[in-house]
Amino acid sequence: MSKKITIYDLAKTLGVSAGTVSRSLNDHPSISMKTKERVISMANELGYKTNKFAVNLSKQKSNTIGVIVPKLNSIFMSTVLAGIEKIVNDAGYNLIISQSLESMEKEKLNAKTLYDSGVDALLVSLAYDTSNFDHFAHYIRNKIPLIFIDRVHNLPNCSTIIINNRLAGFEATEHLISLGCKNLLYVGGNIKRNVYLDRLEGFKDAMEKHQLDFDQTHFLETDLSPDDVDSVIHYIKSMKNAVDGLFVSSDNFAAHIIKALKRENYKIPQDIKIVGFNNDPISDLVTPTLTTVN
C-alpha cells in the first residue's frame, strides 16, 4: 500500500515550510502565484489529497446541509428534495436527509443529530404533531440558518418557503361550486399545520363568496392515512345533507376515498365530485381520474 502524501512530504520535496505548502493550497494572498503553482503541480504529481474535513473544521464549515421531512414516500416531498439536492450539490455542498415519520420526538432527535454533525444550515418541513420548537433553539442561538418549507412555523430570524395554500383551497372549492356542488366537505389534516389550516380558510372563503353556509360539520380533520378512510366514509354517510362535493388535502388519500365510495355504490362524479391536492401521479391512475391542485 502506497504511503499517504502529507503537506510535510510536499514541503520536504519542494524545500519550503509546511506552512507555505498549506497557505499555497488554500490560495492565501501572502503566497506568490509562482509558488502556488509550484506547490499545486507537485501535489498533483505526488497524488496529495486535501483533508477536506480538517480544512472545513478550521473554517467552522462542514459543507453539509441537513433536511428533515415528515416522510420520504411523498411524491411532492421527493420532488422538493430532488430540487434541493441539485441546488445544494451545484453549490459544492452535500445533503443529509432524515425523516421524522410524522413524530415530534423523532424530529427532535433528527435536529440534534444534524446539529451535532455540524451542518451549515437546516431545512425543515414539520412533523404532523410538532407543538414545541425548542429543539431548534441551538440553531437560532448559534446563527445557523434555519429554513422551514411547506409545513412551517414562524420563529425569529428563520425563513419560510410556502405556496399560497389559502388561494389553492379557494380555487379547488370554487371549482366544485362551479360544477353545481352545494353541500361540500373539506377533508384535511391537523390544522396546527399551516398547510391544512390555510386550505381550510380558502375553502371557507369560497363558501362565503358563493353564499353557502359553513359550519364545523363541513370540515373533517384526519391523519390523511388509509387507516382513516372508513371513518371518512362513515362521516359522509352520516351527514344530514348528502355531500355532493369533496375537497381532499391529499391526492393519495382522495384516491383511497374514491375506491371506498365506489365500494359503497356511490357514483363518482355523478353523486360526489372530488378534488385532490398535489398533482400526484396517482390522480391519473384512479377511475375516474382525479381532478387535483398542482
Regions found by a protein language model. Give the residues of each.
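Active-site-adjacent beta->alpha loops and helix N-cap segments on the catalytic face
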Residues: 131-139
